[in-house]
Amino acid sequence: MDWILHLILLLGSPYLTVGFVNNDEVQTLTRYILRGPSRNSGLEWLEPLVDDFGHRMLCRKSLEDAIDFTVERLRQDGFDNVHTEEAPNMPNWERGEDTVTLLEPRNLKLNILTIGGVDPAKVTAEAVVLEDYDLINTTNVNGKIVVFNQKWTGYYEDIKYRRAAKEIKALGAVGLLAKSLGPFSIGSPHTGGGSDEHLPAASLSLEEAELLGRLARRNKTLKISIDIRSKNLPPCTSRNIIFDIKGSEKPEEVVLISAHIDSWDLGQGALDDGGGMAAVWQAMKVIRELGQTDKRFLPKRTIRAIFWTAEEHGFAGAKHYYEQHKNGKEKFYFVSETDQGAFKPTTTKSILRFMGNTTQRAKMQEIVQSLKRNDIPISVQEGDKQGDVQSWADDGVPSVQYVADKGADFYFYFHHTTGDYLNIFEDGDIDYTAAIMGTLAHVLSNQDKW
Amino acid sequence: MDWILHLILLLGSPYLTVGFVNNDEVQTLTRYILRGPSRNSGLEWLEPLVDDFGHRMLCRKSLEDAIDFTVERLRQDGFDNVHTEEAPNMPNWERGEDTVTLLEPRNLKLNILTIGGVDPAKVTAEAVVLEDYDLINTTNVNGKIVVFNQKWTGYYEDIKYRRAAKEIKALGAVGLLAKSLGPFSIGSPHTGGGSDEHLPAASLSLEEAELLGRLARRNKTLKISIDIRSKNLPPCTSRNIIFDIKGSEKPEEVVLISAHIDSWDLGQGALDDGGGMAAVWQAMKVIRELGQTDKRFLPKRTIRAIFWTAEEHGFAGAKHYYEQHKNGKEKFYFVSETDQGAFKPTTTKSILRFMGNTTQRAKMQEIVQSLKRNDIPISVQEGDKQGDVQSWADDGVPSVQYVADKGADFYFYFHHTTGDYLNIFEDGDIDYTAAIMGTLAHVLSNQDKW
């Protein structure tokens, strides 16, 4: 149990700080998680959440029950300031028994998932298959169902296909079938948020988007019928979950680590974003436990964790929280999220997607160097996709989103599919993510200034 | 186009034979496929079969239509002896809207596929989760639904779980839920053949078998309801497809390469076994084309290709053919099948699963050496699973089943799932399989004796 020996040595010696990162502090925290008493605790914490409540769709009982269950556990853990804050007017969309059927050249019920937010609609029309987005500008799509059969180039590059409703509707299209956003499939379409336009729209499995592509290349006329029963319902109120480790010197300066609790209505939302929640919880639990053993470990600034609601619906929960707090007396010093797979980083292709200025970036580099010294390979990369913490990032608060190497590709095997289950995580995945989030939170809560 | 140069050189020079394998002959054939005019032709041949007819379930119109389409194409190709032979009394099973629902500890419609051959049944009972088959002998399963949540160790090792109905019924079990037979899943259960017993039985997705396993380990009582609507119907008659390249010296001695045309009622049966068919067709086409260019390339024995029906139902089509022909005047000299993924071999973990005596095995080794010299890594391995050609293998006819390295594991990502689509094949997969099957057929059709 080398972490115990290390802790004893640490308690007997002053922290040795080079730059603003104290490597002993990072070592204590990461060893406590990866090889010490906290090992596997995040995964164990996650199990009853996803197994007992299942997926947690916004405006559904399973989400609100899961929120209650989580708050109760956080109170038992003894965190500071455990509470929920209401997020009113949340989008309420319910999936129905939707069908999309290829009628010609042969009858085949297609393997689809309706895109979130679409209202009931029926349409039968000829389909045109486009292998690239820009072809909408040179192809007659008027009166047609547009089928996108793009090559996977990455989620953020390809999301325009799923969100094309408004643009293709303006060109006269009567329906949208977008190839699912992922690099690999076993008959597994992906859902996700779409446009507000009431154009019938669904994601096709990779296999069947490619089938339609091949049929079109052989000059077959494709006739497709779309029958959407899904619908929007009156808005609901949901809740964000907040819990703190109160800062000893600057309690009103907040270092934020976060993940989201809501999910789509498929699988059990373990990957997206139960694993993120578990890593955030584990990081918080470890900082609290180490602080109880050694008061010097307690943070100077407040470390706050938030489990957002309504992430899957345009970050609606986080945006509401931001609006409520942006003019408050608390100052957000740093914000972060983990929502692209709480995976173990195995190469320095694992990144902290960072927004901030040059000085701040240099500090991130120091943190990353310290993580590397503790066998956590990772690098800093500029990027502007910060998910739920985007509002603060846009405000100039330094921000990070953790993306493991597996988060760039493997994550999208399962994202928004029926395959989003706890077994995606391998031993250590959540531990490593917790070690990264905990290190960020702890180091930044204690530095003098940005 | 080095194959043309090679062909010219070959035509001008006598075959150089070391042992019984003529390496020039193998090189001509493999180059013609892998880098010559036949490149990609198998994959192109397969496309309309799977895209225009879809899956091809026994006793369904799509199978018989696909048989007619295939026969017509073979006739146009000019093969000898193109015909079908009826296989009567074939099992006729139709999947219904089957549901399996977890009632306690929470309500969840489980992600299942009924096991083939099961008749309508309804049962609600407590479930017991077993992580290993042998636990049926030490666990009280009387009145219970048995859920198997085994670790994947391989298809042939684990198939006992799917076929456990008879045995667990004898112990008083009232239902069977078997974890799907595969190493990896994206919410993708696998179907397959089961037992004849009328015990309600279905395959669970990996994810949900593991979910039930975790709930049981946390001492939750599991209550499950099974409602099977699938049913057996009166038997039907289907057809095997036979086509030859007639032997020039020993036409009544048959060298057989084969694959099966029927599939389960999911996906499009491209992997299982459209790819096998395409490779067999491509091998036959190439041998015929090379023989037209150079008469010396024509086989001395008859090379026969068969596309079996009813493979998915206990090899019923092949067994019928065997019974009809075992006492005929034709002598089966060698039999083979490709039905475990028509993939490119990338390592010598790719095998010819071989049954035969020591002398025959030595000859297989020579063929394999020649394939290796032509950049096709493969090895010979003893094994007794020869699929549709098992009857001949059991009779002592030397036999081979081709299993690429990807056939051991990756194949079972898709096997009997909704993900069995043409896109599984990468560039070259079917070409390489055709090169192997073609080499086996051609070399063995021309050797003096075993």
Q: Where does each model-flagged region fall?
A:
Chain A
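N-terminal capping segment at the start of a domain
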Residues: 20-60, 186-194, 262, 334, ...
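Metal-dependent peptidase/peptidase-like ectodomains
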Residues: 107, 265, 308-412
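His/Asp/Glu-rich mid-to-C-terminal helical/loop segments that flank catalytic regions of hydrolases
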Residues: 285, 410-450
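Extracellular/luminal Protease-associated
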Residues: 60, 109-200, 268, 378
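Noncatalytic luminal/extracellular "stalk/propeptide" segments of secretory-pathway proteins
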Residues: 31, 35, 47-145, 150-152
